[in-house]
Amino acid sequence: MVRLKDIALQAHVSSATVSRILNRDDSLSVTEETRERVLRIAEELGYQPSAKRRKPRGYGRDSAPLIGVVSCLSPEEERQDPYFSAIRKGVEDECFKQEIFITSSIHLGSFQEHIFHELDGVIVIGSLHDEALTSISGTFKHAVFINSTPNPARHDSVSADFYAAAQQAIEHLLSLGYERLGYIGGQEKEHTVKNGVNSKRTIEDKRLTAFLKTARPQPDHVKIGEYSMHEGYRLMKESIAGGTLPDAFFIASDSMAIGALKALQEAGLQVPRDTAIVSFNGIEEAEFASTPLTTVKVYTEEMGRTGVKLLLDRVNGRTIPLTVTLPTSLIVRQSCGS
């Protein structure tokens, strides 16, 4: 059994500090780096807190439910991805508000190494392939999926309509008079586990589907890599080297767009004078990019909070599965020229 002392030794803090961080004591004055280090070590060690909990506000059970969080991303991937880290923050904030401690927080690759029989339910962040979905469904009575909608006749889910949101962004560019549009994006992945190894497969990316249907681009104006800032930089350099630059780009994540901006600046090109950009996700950094980004705002923290509420409703007796699709907003800034 992992003790607070074990976490404290690895994190180089006191056991009291570990306890207060794990219990979300907002009166504790520590750096964000220390807090994240303690939470990461606790997760990596598989720390299991006491099952004694206070009843969440507004729910009828005598004790609070025991819930877990399963992330399809590795710890490193999640830390580097503002989109998914914001979803987790929403989950954690709502659990704190409801006075619930997340009993288990694990990543898909280590799923089979944990014991879950005492949990009332889990929140799954990300997209699962059939095998992993079957494993989750067979292990937990209640599961809520965030950022995917598997089997809506059985499971609750929270997501955003990426197709409609992307279409709105592309139509905004077209309405401004841009005719030749380019696309920079990554690959949408589904996750599964085989023999304890986390593997992925590429699935349809609704943002790309919307772009191809709405913009009807030239094939060489569509650049696909991985969802990262570095890949956005690389793919924009590739576009610049190709000769004729599109009038405007729809870039499928803010992080990729920030990388793309750097490539354009290095080439002496200005946004939106030489090419315009609309991106996706609405992370905080988009507002403070070298050219503030017009972006589709996805309410990721609210997705996390809603997932917790749905799970509590399920545990409290609701039997009808709910599919929640949150709205998005187009935040217009300097990068699109309007």
Language model feature labels by segment:
Residues 1-59:
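N-terminal helix-turn-helix DNA-binding module of bacterial transcription factors
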Residues 14, 48, 65, 120, ...:
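Short acidic/polar active-site loop segments enriched in Thr and Asp
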Residues 59-171, 175, 241, 255:
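Alpha-helical recognition/docking segments in bacterial nutrient-uptake
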Residues 74-85, 106-110, 158-168, 184-237, ...:
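Hinge/beta->alpha junction and helix N-cap segments in small-molecule ligand-binding domains
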Residues 116-125, 182-185, 222-223, 243-253, ...:
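Periplasmic-binding protein-like
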Residues 179-180, 218-219, 271-276:
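Short acidic capping loops at alpha-helix termini that bridge into adjacent secondary structure
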Residues 237-338:
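Flexible loop/turn connectors
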